[in-house]
Amino acid sequence: MRTLFIGDLHLSADRLDITQAFNRFLDTELDDADALYILGDLFEVWVGDDLAAPFALELARKLNQVSQRLPIYFIHGNRDFMLGKQFADVAGMQMLPEVTCLDLYGVNTVILHGDSLCTLDKAYQRFRKLRSFAFARWLYSCLPKKKRQAIANKIRSNSQSSNQQKSYVIMDVEPSAVDALFAQSHCKQMIHGHTHRPAIHEFTNGCKRIVVGDWYEQGSVLVVSSDGVDLKSLPFDAS
């Protein structure tokens, strides 16, 4: 048996090829799987469950069918932090805290989206702190639909522009933040996404940090079993 981890699909109506590849993944890659974990940014943008796009609702029905065979767990990312219980229930996804510890075949593992580890990006961390307040999310959800969409589009545009000007180092995880999370969680293994830099980092103290990749040009999935970990790429034309 095996457990699969994915993240950073950034699904949108503008990139239905990614949605199609994800559907093929759901059809072909989950045989004998114990569970599927989605580590955030499943969608490029999410302004509220009441504004879910038609393609997202169709995907929710697909995920719900899959959830009849195996559990699907979801952790919010920085793009879909407004995804709520209403949509999660329709999709058959179980929402997890932003930092979750679990036993993966005998290995204590901490999983998260990963944006909280990029502590050198001070501007983003200020925004992240603001959106962490339940009142701020509630206030946003009370706005008219068009206003919410406009704000989301503005944030997305500003983020893309800002990221182009930020250095490689600032947009990666900060080693001290990684060390702190290992210490706080008492785990030997960490799995996250967000940085779009798939890799398996092994430390001299025996700890391991695994980064799942994005789905812009090809799929990325981490397969964990009792035999170890396998970070795989899935070409869109063959996934």
Swiss-Prot record:
GO biological process: lipid A biosynthetic process
EC number: 3.6.1.54
Cofactor note: Binds 2 Mn(2+) ions per subunit in a binuclear metal center.
Subcellular location(s) of the protein: Cell inner membrane
Catalytic activity: UDP-2-N,3-O-bis[(3R)-3-hydroxytetradecanoyl]-alpha-D-glucosamine + H2O = 2-N,3-O-bis[(3R)-3-hydroxytetradecanoyl]-alpha-D-glucosaminyl 1-phosphate + UMP + 2 H(+)
Binding-site positions, Mn(2+) 1: D8, H10, D41, H196
InterPro entries from the UniProt entry: Calcineurin-like_PHP_ApaH, LpxH-like, Metallo-depent_PP-like, UDP-diacylglucosamine_Hdrlase
GO molecular function: manganese ion binding; UDP-2,3-diacylglucosamine hydrolase activity
Pathway(s) served: Glycolipid biosynthesis; lipid IV(A) biosynthesis; lipid IV(A) from (3R)-3-hydroxytetradecanoyl-[acyl-carrier-protein] and UDP-N-acetyl-alpha-D-glucosamine: step 4/6
Keywords noted in UniProt: Cell inner membrane, Cell membrane, Hydrolase, Lipid A biosynthesis, Lipid biosynthesis, Lipid metabolism, Manganese, Membrane, Metal-binding
List of residues binding substrate: N78, R79, D121, S159, N163, K166, H194
Record's bilayer topology term: Peripheral membrane protein
Disulfide bonds: none
Binding site for Mn(2+) 2: D41, N78, H113, H194
Domain of life: Bacteria
A GO CC annotation given for this chain: cytoplasm
Cofactor(s) essential for the protein: Mn(2+)
Pfam families from the UniProt entry: Metallophos
Cited function: Hydrolyzes the pyrophosphate bond of UDP-2,3-diacylglucosamine to yield 2,3-diacylglucosamine 1-phosphate (lipid X) and UMP by catalyzing the attack of water at the alpha-P atom. Involved in the biosynthesis of lipid A, a phosphorylated glycolipid that anchors the lipopolysaccharide to the outer membrane of the cell.
Family: Belongs to the LpxH family.
Protein name as annotated: UDP-2,3-diacylglucosamine hydrolase
Organism: Shewanella sp. (strain ANA-3)
Gene name, Swiss-Prot/TrEMBL: lpxH
